[in-house]
Amino acid sequence: MSERDAGFIAAVEEAQKGSNEGGVPIGAALVSADGKILGRGHNMRLQKDSATLHAEISALENAGRLPAAAYRGATMYTTLSPCDMCTGACVMYGVKRVVIGENKTFVGGEEYLKQRGIEVVVLENEKCKELMKKFIEEKPGDWNEDIGED
């Protein structure tokens, strides 16, 4: 797993799209075991006034209704460590691996993923860190809301 994987590139593109829209710059892509991008998306909470439309949920939604077997063996690429909600979605659908762009800004459910037998890979990507740093500096209140803090 590396920064050159098509799934990670798609996730970063989605994060940039979210940033360009004025939203939380987090992107994700769900990739099948054979390397096909099943779905990709970005955090749309601000753009759609949504309580739940985080990047991973957006990627799952954009993948559409799939048979359970499609998720097994799949990899979720995400630009930031997944929150508890997105961690739960990965566990529920039986995703095999979660590849994280960075986890310095926020550490979500990585340990829980590991406990549930899901491989976790952290890339510490500078672009992901820069996008989050800029967003948090410009919109600290929106960031705190996104992660459920006051």
Residue ranges, per PLM feature:
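Immediate flanking context of iron-sulfur cluster ligation sites
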Residues: 69-81
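A short, polar/charged loop-to-alpha-helix boundary motif
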Residues: 44-57
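Short beta-strand scaffold segments in enzyme catalytic cores
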Residues: 26-35
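Zinc-dependent deaminase
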Residues: 1-18, 82, 88-150
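Short, flexible loop/turn motifs enriched in small residues
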Residues: 21-25
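Non-catalytic interface/targeting segments
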Residues: 9, 32-33, 48, 129
